[in-house]
Amino acid sequence: MPDTLLEVTMQRRDFLKSASLAVLMPQVPSLMAQMRSALPLKITDIRIVRLKVVRETGAIVAAWNPGTVITERIGGGSIVEIHTDQGLSGIGPGMDAAWLEAAKAQLVGKNPFDLERLAGPLRYYIGGSPHSISALEIALWDLIGKAAGQPVYKLWGADKDRVPAYASMIQLSTPEERVRMAVQLKSEGWKAIKLRAHYPTLKEDVQMVEAVRKAVGDGMDIMVDANQAQSFGSWQPGVMWDFRRALETARELQALNCLWLEEPRLRYQFDELARLSSLVDIPIAGGENNRGVHEYRWILEQKVYGIVQPDIMVADGVTGFREIGALAQAHHKRLIPHHGGGNLGTITHLHAIASWPNSPWIEILHDPPAAPYTNGFAIFENPPRVDPQGYLNLPQGPGLGVEIRKDLIVA
């Protein structure tokens, strides 16, 4: 029995939080059990499939990694395939080949509909590669959707059939070029642009945002990313912000009617970030490099961010990613995922966002001409496109609803 009013209050809060999570998480396990009995499948093999490079499209320097030149290309990389005894297969982003045999040991001979039962062993035996866990679970959900004959987002509980996309810049560039880009994107139907705040001084960052706001008016939303949470520790390349710069920047961006300020401090400066969130009205966003439901529980309970941004390739696989989504709903917080890598991770984000009423945007890395989002989507036979109204429509085919171009597969 609780002895104090505080204990009663805490027990009531924990009960309500648990009850909220139970209501918010779609009843996938029971649905999976029903489909498992109706659709017996057995995993027979897992393969890593390499993709041909079609062509290079240019070189860029990412704002968060100054001095490092990235060659952008169409094609290349790899995907993972999970095959079954019924001829169905699922696809996911490429996984680390070093973990392939461990993955086979846990999945071959199993029914993909037992995903909740398989999630624990995957984390135990492949825990050193969260990217690989995510790749495998994405492929499993693609397989489950194909077996059920439904798009993944409908299995997760569809809230919407299209999602507004925002164009996320990669380079710092110049104010003049970012103005040109913003005006062009607005004319193409994009509803929002995310700029990078990486100039040596606060004044230069603000002047860039001011120039873009003046050019596009109030008819286009602007987000700003400081990318201050890229490393585990207290060092990263480029300019380092202190709390004062974060606070002053947030106030300036608030006056410019920006939607949010992203990652203005180090990844684990939770106390400072919570304090910053309490001092400004503009939402502080972040979390793309945080991993695990436990970290997000702390972030949400301590009101670290106004908007949480998990990435399915980092957070904790599809299983953990969706649990984080339910947790954000229980705390009445918006969840707007990080970009997901640009191809199959991004497509999986699209399905998840379509199942969450508290998720109003999808991030699309799009910095043409060298790095348009179409580069990542070019590996698909039926690539989604941002429509003239600025939306990505949900694929309606079963599973993820996309297939890999056969001409790109390395034999």
What are these regions (language model features)?
Residues 87, 136, 149, 261, ...:
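Conserved, mostly hydrophobic/aromatic
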Residues 36-86, 373-379:
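Structured beta-strand/loop patches that form or line metal/cofactor-binding pockets in enzymes
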Residues 110, 114-117, 268-285, 290-391, ...:
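Shared catalytic-loop signature of beta/alpha-barrel
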Residues 162-280:
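Metal-dependent enolase-superfamily TIM-barrel catalytic cores that perform enediolate-based chemistry
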Residues 1-11:
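N-terminal secretory signal peptides
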Residues 137-172:
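Glycine-rich, aromatic-flanked loop segments that form ligand/cofactor-binding clefts
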Residues 40, 45-49, 83-148:
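Metal- or metallocofactor-binding catalytic centers and their adjacent structured scaffolds
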Residues 2, 14-33:
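N-terminal export signals
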